[in-house]
Design a protein with these regions (language model features):
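Short, conserved micro-motifs composed of acidic
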Residues: 1-23
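Flexible loop/turn segments at secondary-structure boundaries
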Residues: 2-5, 79, 86-89, 149-152, ...
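Beta-strand elements of modular eukaryotic interaction domains
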Residues: 19, 130-134, 142-144, 207-208, ...
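C-terminal reverse transcriptase regions that engage the nucleic-acid substrate
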Residues: 22-135, 140, 155
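Alpha-helix capping and helix-loop boundary segments enriched in small/acidic/polar residues
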Residues: 53, 57, 100, 179-187, ...
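A short, polar/acidic, helix/strand-boundary loop motif
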Residues: 62, 159-191
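Acidic, metal-ligating active-site segments
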Residues: 139, 143-168
Length: 222
């Protein structure tokens, strides 16, 4: 598949299509910050971290803070899955909803809250071809899936080739916490394979089948 070269003019979608003024600090929507000038998206979770300062560290408040994170594409999956694992551990220890957390769990929750502030250092390009200045010769989807005793994940990358080399960008991911009832690694990886297959189908349909599925890697067991 061949695509037309991207325009060399430094004009962002915000300026050319939406008529938004440049030079501002960007637009913040649902915890995401859109930089008009650079045409990048950054998860802004500092407000949630500050909110946590006024809340006691309890089992109830962990999912309460997690619910404030808007990440439909799973771009910060490692951050959200950590909170889910900690909440599951609190359930495993049969901690009451309003009882204060202590020990290792409390320290882990506090470390997770601090990591929310660091998410502002993560930036994603809104446009997949943002820095491409030559003709795209081929593009494809590459999927990866794996599982552990605590969680499992599927992730899809968009890979495209030009005359100067190959480039890849993460498109989306799905993360899940392993069930409280312990399952074997092979069974968890089979579940992960199903998630990857569904996610790949969704992404391909969203792109109107303009790309091919070149590679799907699963865990070593499956």
């Amino acid at each position: 598949m061949k695509l037309d070269p991207v325009s060399t003019e430094n004009v962002t979608y915000a300026k050319s299509s939406l008529g938004l003024k440049m030079g501002s600090n960007g637009q913040k929507v649902l915890g995401l910050s859109w930089d008009f000038e650079q045409d990048t998206i950054t998860p802004e979770l500092t407000a949630i971290a500050k909110r946590a300062e006024d809340l006691p560290a309890t089992k109830r408040n962990t999912p309460r803070l997690l619910a404030g994170i808007f990440d439909p594409l799973g771009m910060i999956g490692p951050t959200t899955i950590t909170a889910k694992i900690l909440f599951q551990e609190a359930c495993r220890q049969k901690i009451n909803w309003n009882d204060p957390l202590d020990g290792v769990i409390k320290q882990a929750v506090e470390a997770w809250i601090e990591s929310l502030i660091e998410c502002k250092l993560i930036t994603f390009d809104r446009c997949l071809y943002k820095h491409v200045r030559e003709e795209v010769l081929e593009c494809s989807l590459h999927g990866f899936a794996d599982a552990s005793k605590k969680a499992y994940c599927a992730v899809i990358y968009f890979v495209y080739q030009t005359s100067t080399g190959s480039y890849s960008k993460m498109l989306t991911s799905k993360t899940r916490v392993a069930p409280l009832k312990e399952l074997s690694i092979p069974r968890l990886e089979l579940i992960t394979c199903l998630i990857l297959a569904k996610l790949m189908s969704t992404v391909k349909n969203a792109l109107n089948s303009q790309v091919s599925v070149r590679k799907q890697n699963f865990g070593q067991t499956v």
